[in-house]
UniProtKB/Swiss-Prot annotation:
Pfam families: Trm112p (PF03966). Belongs to the UPF0434 family. HAMAP family: UPF0434. This is UPF0434 protein MS0934. PANTHER family: PROTEIN PREY, MITOCHONDRIAL, ZGC:162634. It comes from Mannheimia succiniciproducens (strain KCTC 0769BP / MBEL55E). One of its GO terms (cellular component) is cytosol. InterPro entries: Trm112-like.
Length: 61
């Protein structure tokens, strides 16, 4: 994912900064404790598609 894109996109729920998790192909919002999938290189920034980090075994600490 382009680092410039990562600097301008934000969490759709809280508008917080997102962190890239390359290994699991997702963007993480540490404020809301949710992750958004990246599908074929495109971030899916829909709250309905987000996965709770509390329930996800791939959570990175």
């Amino acid at each position: 994912m382009d680092s410039r894109l990562l600097e301008i996109i934000a969490c759709p729920r809280c508008q917080g900064r997102l962190q890239l998790d390359k290994e699991n192909e997702r963007l993480i919002c540490r404020f809301e404790h949710i992750a958004f999938p990246i599908v074929q290189g495109i971030p899916v920034l829909l709250v309905e598609e987000a996965v709770s980090l509390a329930e996800d075994p791939k959570d990175i600490t």
